[in-house]
Amino acid sequence: MEALSERFSALQDKLMDLYESGLEDLETQIQHWKLLRQEQILLYYARKRGIMRLGYQPVPPLATSEIKAKDAIAIGILLESLQKSKYADEPWTLVETSLETIRSPPVDCFKKGPKTVEVYFDGDPENVMPYTVWSYIYYQTDEDTWEKVEGHVDYTGAYFYEGQLKNYYIKFEADAKRFGTTGMWEVHVNKDTVFTPVTSSTPPVGDASNNAVPEASTTSLSSPQRSPSTNRRYGRKASSPTATTRRQKRQGKETLTRRRKTRSRSRSREQRGGRETQRSSSRGASKSPRRGGRSGGGPLTRSRSRSRSPESVTGGGVAPSEVGASLRSVSRHSSGRLAQLLDAAKDPPVILLRGGANTLKCYRYRFRKKHAGKFYYVSTTWSWIGGHSTDRVGRARMLIAFHSNHEREKCIQEMKLPLGVDWSYGQFDDL
């Protein structure tokens, strides 16, 4: 007990000396997180021995010490990786390497030069939300190297370029739906740079067309410039209520006319189909009518039976019970190209992990050591992008491939995923 208290007191003294030194080099920050990790290890050990207090320090629960120790290990790994980069000689403070700064958006990146951006929802200065954005962002690449880029702000949100990809770490649209009513907002940087919507047809929140965000100019946070639209609240004059009403009436009439024509053609086809069915049944013909329509009089046509078949391709992907079925049986019926592709997707087992990019990288490092020889391949981190832009969609991904389903299930039982990482099953025809 006394020896444990003395060791804990010695750690506290080292931490106090480090805080008082005020050194701003990377080696000091790495040492700081090593001391914090050792502190949590001592607290964890003391709690497990039933010790509730070390000196004047209450001993926290085991789960608290465990989480803080893991955080210290993760930050230490990031700092040691950064120390091998060309940015190791830059000044680094305790705030810039703190857990709160690293876990703030963009997550698991080092950041410098915080600035406050104010967003006025509905153009109302009273309905304002402040956001913290960054002048410089240090992100880790898939090759475990570090790159330094400038942070930017536009009408959509705050972002930085990760290679050629435009990576938004803050988007104002989500909060506009929560705190606004019109779906529009103004972005104020340094009290004088303003970004406002430049179209008069910006749809309100909840409209199906609200996915298209109005184009706006962009500024770099390291050297903000005044937006040319600061003299006006909105980039263009909004359409007058009279013109809008006329346009809506005209569009409504056109839509109504199209619906009537479509309904008339559909009714005509149904009537023809019904007459053919009656003539066919009265003659005792065995041949089904050419057009069954919606009359329901004749036997099922080929198209109808296909659309209602339980094996329809449109029914979705592969059921869990069918996984690996293509290797065990031969198909008894021919199918379309999409069905063949779905049948082919039942082979080598994989696990798909989803989480923060750097969190997955740190986990991959530990996974390869702990599970060596128990898996086939593990991929680098990657992301999906949309069909019409290079913006990343969702969280980062990582794949782990196995030789067999048994090997995969055994790994799932043994692996411990970091907080914020989830997984799902997957199959590939080939690797």
UniProtKB/Swiss-Prot annotation:
What is an example of a Pfam family matching this protein?
PPV_E2_N
Among Gene3D superfamilies, the record links this protein to: 3.30.70.330, E2 (early) protein, N terminal domain, subdomain 1 (1.10.287.30), Papillomavirus E2 early protein domain (2.170.200.10)
Q: Do you know which InterPro entries this protein is assigned to?
A: E2/EBNA1_C_sf (IPR035975), Nucleotide-bd_a/b_plait_sf (IPR012677), Papillomavirus_E2_C (IPR000427), PPV_E2_N (IPR001866), Reg_prot_E2 (IPR033668), Regulatory_protein_E2_N (IPR036050), Regulatory_protein_E2_N_1 (IPR042503), Regulatory_protein_E2_N_2 (IPR042504)
The protein's predominant localisation is host cell
What are the start and end residues of every segment in region (DNA-binding domain)? 347-431
Q: Where in the cell is it found?
A: Host nucleus
Q: Give the GO terms filed under biological process for this record.
A: DNA replication; DNA-templated transcription; regulation of DNA replication; viral DNA genome replication
Composition-biased stretches, type Polar residues, lie in 208-232
Residue ranges, annotated region (Disordered): 195-330
Gene Ontology CC annotations of this record: host cell nucleus
Give residue spans, biased composition: Basic and acidic residues: 267-278
Q: Which GO terms describe its molecular function?
A: DNA binding; DNA-binding transcription factor activity; nucleotide binding
List compositional bias (Low complexity) regions by residue number: 195-205
Residues annotated as region Transactivation domain?
1-201
The post-translation modification note in this UniProt entry reads: Phosphorylated.
Keyword list, A-Z: Activator, DNA replication, DNA-binding, Early protein, Host nucleus, Phosphoprotein, Repressor, Transcription, Transcription regulation
The record's note on quaternary structure and interaction partners says: Binds DNA as homodimer. Interacts with protein E1; this interaction greatly increases E1 DNA-binding activity. Interacts with protein L1; this interaction enhances E2-dependent replication and transcription activation. Interacts with protein L2; this interaction inhibits E2 transcriptional activity but not DNA replication function E2. Interacts with protein E7; this interaction inhibits E7 oncogenic activity. Interacts with host TAF1; this interaction modulates E2-dependent transcriptional regulation. Interacts with host BRD4; this interaction mediates E2 transcriptional activation function.
Task of the protein: Plays a role in the initiation of viral DNA replication. A dimer of E2 interacts with a dimer of E1 in order to improve specificity of E1 DNA binding activity. Once the complex recognizes and binds DNA at specific sites, the E2 dimer is removed from DNA. E2 also regulates viral transcription through binding to the E2RE response element (5'-ACCNNNNNNGGT-3') present in multiple copies in the regulatory regions of the viral genome. Activates or represses transcription depending on E2RE's position with regards to proximal promoter elements including the TATA-box.
Question: Which family is this sequence assigned to?
Answer: Belongs to the papillomaviridae E2 protein family.
Record-given protein name:
Regulatory protein E2
